[in-house]
Amino acid sequence: MKKLAIVFTMLLIAGCSSSQDSANNQIDELGKENNSLFTFRNIQSGLMIHNGLHQHGRETIGWEIVPVKTPEEALVTDQSGWIMIRTPNTDQCLGTPDGRNLLKMTCNSTAKKTLFSLIPSTTGAVQIKSVLSGLCFLDSKNSGLSFETGKCIADFKKPFEVVPQSHLWMLNPLNTESPII
C-alpha cells in the first residue's frame, strides 16, 4: 500500500510538471500569433504614420515596437525607456536624421536617429518623442511621414497640464481587411 501511494504521488507530480510545460508552450504559441503590429494615428486628425499601403489605402505592413536598452541617466527624462519603431522582419526603422523629419532608415541605436520614447497620457494615447532632438511629433496637414515637431508636454511638476490633441497618438491594430470565416 505504501509503494502504491509513493507511485501515485510521483505520477501526480510528474503529471503536474508536464502540464505546466504544456501551458508554457501554449503561451509561447499565442505570443507567436499575436505579433503586436501597430499603426500610429493622430488623435486630432486621424492621420497615420504609414509603413506600407495597398491601392485601397489599407496598411499592409504596420510597425513593430522594439525595446532598446536605455541608459540609467536617460531614464530620468524618458521614464518609459527607449524604443525603435521597426518594419517587421527587416532592419528598417522609423527614424529622424535631423530630429525633425520622419524617414525609414536602417535601424541603429548608437546614433539615436532611430530611437524614440513614448510619453503616456491619461487618455491611453502617447506622445512620440525623438531621442535625438527631444521634440515630439505633432499632427500634420499631410498623411505619411511628413509631420511637424514641437515641444513635448511632459512636466512631472505639472501632472494635470492638458496635452493638445495634435500631440497625441493612438497605437491601433493594423487597418487590414478581416478574413471571411
UniProtKB/Swiss-Prot annotation:
Species of origin reads Escherichia coli
Task: Identify where the record puts lipid attachment of type N-palmitoyl cysteine.
Answer: 16
Q: Which GO terms describe its cellular component?
A: cell outer membrane
Has keyword Lipoprotein?
Answer: yes
What exactly does this protein do?
Part of the tripartite complex that is required for the CDT activity. CdtC, along with CdtA, probably forms a heterodimeric subunit required for the delivery of CdtB.
- Primary location recorded for the protein, binned into one broad class: membrane
Q: Where is the lipid attached (S-diacylglycerol cysteine)?
A: 16
This chain's protein is named: Cytolethal distending toxin subunit C
Instruction: Tell me a Gene Ontology molecular-function term this record carries.
Output: carbohydrate binding
Under the subunit heading, UniProt states: Heterotrimer of 3 subunits, CdtA, CdtB and CdtC.
Q: Which key words are in the record?
A: Cell outer membrane, Lectin, Lipoprotein, Membrane, Palmitate, Signal, Toxin, Virulence
| Residues of the Ricin B-type lectin domain | 79-181
Q: Which residues form the signal peptide?
A: 1-15
Family annotation (CDD domains): beta-trefoil_Ricin_CdtC
**What InterPro entries does the record tag this protein with?**
CDtoxinA/C, CDtoxinC, Ricin_B-like_lectins
Matching entries from SUPFAM superfamilies are given as:
Ricin B-like lectins
Q: What else is known?
A: The operon of the strain O128:H- / 9142-88 / EPEC is referred to as cdt type II (CDT-II).
Organism superkingdom: Bacteria
Q: Where in the cell is it found?
A: Cell outer membrane
